[in-house]
Amino acid sequence: FWFFSYHDKSHLVVNNATLSSQLQLLKDPNVLRYCQYYSVVFGGYVGLALWMTKYYVTTYDFDLKQAALLAACFSLPGGVLRALGGWISDKYGAYHVTWGVMWVCLGSLFLLSYPQTHMVIETVNGPMTWDIGLSPIPFTVLLFIVGIAMAVGKASVFKFISDEYSSNIGAVSGIVGLVGGLAGF
């Protein structure tokens, strides 16, 4: 590849950026905003992928193989769907796609947030019981909706960066990626 490919001279850096000039980007509120977006979509994606196996085992009594298979099915499509997210962001704009992703995540995560609950209320006529919570199928469907939204959102955040920081795309992408990675762990 190295011998048979060429480089475009316009892609080469013409000025030497200093470390201090790159670190000045940390003072830009937009960079910090993109860090927050990416910590939700990437950090949340990684966090969910790491958490879901144990949750399936402890909450739904799945065996480890079933839970790991669901976690793998959640994690693997993220790359393909990220490419789709790039196309959607190019077509509809990073702003609309990112906010759509955030609203889908908010609604789905709200529904996922309520734990399995068994309530008993003592009444005059005896105890009344209620069970509240999601069974494994709706839980998994909602989790996959969140995963798809987060995969699309990972691309839309970088579309923001390429639109607004074309001359500093490397530094801003590095900062945003660092924050997103830290958020997942």
Describe the predicted segments one by one:
Residues 81-93:
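Helix-to-loop junctions at the C-terminal end of transmembrane segments
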Residues 4, 40, 73, 77, ...:
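Small/hydrophobic positions within alpha-helical transmembrane segments
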Residues 54, 155-164, 177:
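Intracellular helix-loop hinge segments at the cytoplasmic ends of transmembrane helices
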Residues 63-71, 135, 139, 172-173:
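Juxtamembrane helix-start elements in MFS-like secondary transporters
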Residues 12, 28-79:
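Extracytoplasmic gate region of multi-pass secondary transporters
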Residues 2-10, 38, 42-50, 151, ...:
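Recurrent gating helices in multi-pass secondary carriers
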Residues 167-185:
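A late C-terminal transmembrane helix in Major Facilitator Superfamily
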Residues 95-156:
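C-terminal transmembrane helical hairpin of 12-TM major facilitator-type secondary transporters
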